[in-house]
Design a protein with these regions (language model features):
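A short glycine-rich, Lys/Arg-flanked "PGG" loop and its adjoining helix->strand segment in the class I
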Residues: 16-30
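Conserved beta-strand signature within the Rossmann-like core of class I S-adenosyl-L-methionine
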Residues: 31-38
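A short beta-strand submotif of the Rossmann-like class I SAM-dependent methyltransferase core
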Residues: 1-2
């Protein structure tokens, strides 16, 4: 799991480069998964597309999950991720997994599957033509702080959401969304509300 601070912080942009992702890929064990955080708020669309393009240049099997309105998790493996989605349901009965997920409001597999936002083809389309970030061209380190007050979160949310149509979702995700009850959607809403709640670490 790579959840650095925002890329406008000095030195953090190096954790969004091709070299960083290549290093992560080299260390993945068979069946291992990388989860890379990104965000849609206070960032230009150009920079967000570059982050996605850089990630998919190393992990072409990458997928995207929206954990709330502003946070994106890009999840990838050495093997295609979409065929692994069924593991979410089959492994849910593990006490440790279910307990940990319940702490963040995910009570059943639908809660997690409903967060799926984009598959490899959609991510590739979103990042098409964007600059691939590398250690020799650390553009993000300079563009990110410059765009903090210029970027439109609403525009980024809309453009990112537009890359996936319902019919393009994996069959498992699509079928679970089609069959979801009102109670399940309310449970999802509760989970999303919980994801927006936070406390200062040193207050605990």
């Amino acid at each position: 799991i790579s959840e650095p601070s925002n890329p406008w912080i000095a030195g953090v942009a190096s954790l969004f480069t091709r070299e960083f992702f290549e290093g992560a890929r080299a260390r993945l064990a068979p069946g291992g998964i990388i989860c890379q955080w990104a965000h849609t708020y206070t960032i230009s669309e150009r920079d967000l597309r570059s982050i996605v393009a850089t990630f998919t240049s190393v992990f072409p099997n990458g997928t995207a999950w929206m954990v709330n309105d502003n946070d994106v998790l890009m999840v990838a493996s050495l093997d295609p991720v979409v065929p692994m989605l069924g593991n979410i349901e089959s492994h849910w009965s593990r006490a440790t997994a279910a307990g940990n997920l319940a702490e963040v409001g995910a009570i059943e597999p639908f809660d997690v599957l409903s967060l799926f936002a984009a598959g490899p083809a959609e991510l590739a389309r979103y990042g098409a033509g964007a600059d691939v970030l590398d250690d020799d061209r650390m553009r993000l380190e300079f563009s990110a702080p410059r765009e903090i007050h210029n970027a439109s979160t609403g525009d980024n949310d809309a453009s990112f959401a537009a890359i996936t149509q319902f019919d393009a979702l994996p069959e498992l995700v699509r079928s679970r969304r089609e069959r979801a009850t009102a109670a399940q959607w309310r449970g999802r809403a509760d989970m999303m509300a919980k994801s927006d709640a936070y406390s200062i670490a040193y207050d605990d």
